[in-house]
Amino acid sequence: MNITTPTQPIRTPGDILANIPGILGFFPAESAILISIQPSPHGYSIGPVARLNLGDVPGALQEVMDAFHCGNPEIIFCFVLSQRREAELWDILYSLYRFEDRSGLGIDACWLAEELSTDTAYDLTFGHATESGEGPLQDWMEGTIPAISTSHSMRACVDNGLLPELTRSDLVQRFTAQNPYFAEEEISAMERCAEELAQQMRAGEGYGTTDPVEVVEHLIADVYYVLSEVDSLEEALENEELLCVAAMWMSTTWTRDLVIKDLLAAPQEAGALLLAVARTFHLSLIHI
C-alpha cells in the first residue's frame, strides 16, 4: 500500500512514525497514536491524527472515531509508543483489537514501538493483510523508524522556523497565558465581552442588523480586515481590539467554524493572533 503526506509517499509504518513529531508538534511518549487513512486524488493519504494517553484507552476511542468521521476514513492505523513490557500492555492492545465504533469501523492494524527515534524498531501487534489475503507484507510486520529529520512533516517545520517540542508539556507551555500588557481584571472583562458578542451574533444580531444572513456575511468579511492589522505576535498581545475580536471568534464553535477557512488562508497572521489569544485568556473560550 502506498500512502502519501501532501508531497511524500509513505511505504511502510516506519515512514508514518517518522512523520508523527512534525504532525503533532512534539515527540509523544507512553501514547496511542490513531491515524485515519482516506482516499485522495493521488491514492490514499493521511487524514486526521489523534494522540491518547495510554490510560485513556479504550475510554476515549469512540470520541476520537467520531471526530475522524468528519473526514472520509477508510482505514484506521494505531501506533502504541511505550517503554513498558508487552505483557503489561496486553489489556490496552486487546481493547484496541476489539474496538469497533458505532458505524462498525475498527482499528485495522496496530504497531508497537518503544519510542519515536531514528532506528527504533517497530513490530506489528495485529492486522494488516495483503490483497491476496496470505498475510502481512514483511515491511509492514516489522522494521525500524527511518530518519525523522528528513520526514516531510519535519522538513515543513524546519522550513517555517520551527521544531517539534520534546514533550507535550513543553508544547502546551508555549500557549500558557503570559500577556504582560493587561491586568487580570482587564482580561476578564475582555473575555466576558467576547462571549457576549459571540452569543449575540449566534442569535442573529450584530453589525447594526437583526438579519442573521447579514450578520454572518459581516462576520466573515471582517476576518480579512482583522488579519491585515496583524503585524507580529508582540503587537497582537498589546492590541485590545484585535484580541477581543479573535476571542469572540473562538468563543463558540459556531463563530469559529465560520471563520476557520479564512484563518487557514492566512496562516502567519492567524497563527500570531490566535497565539496571542491563547497567551491572554486563561479559560477555555469554546462553550457551544
Question: For the regions a protein language model found, what residue spans apply to each?
Answer:
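Calmodulin-binding IQ motif helices
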Residues: 288
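Charged, compositionally biased boundary regions
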Residues: 2-22, 27-29, 47-285
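Short acidic-glycine loop/turn motifs at beta-strand connectors
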Residues: 37-42, 114-116
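Short beta-strand scaffold segments in enzyme catalytic cores
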Residues: 32-36
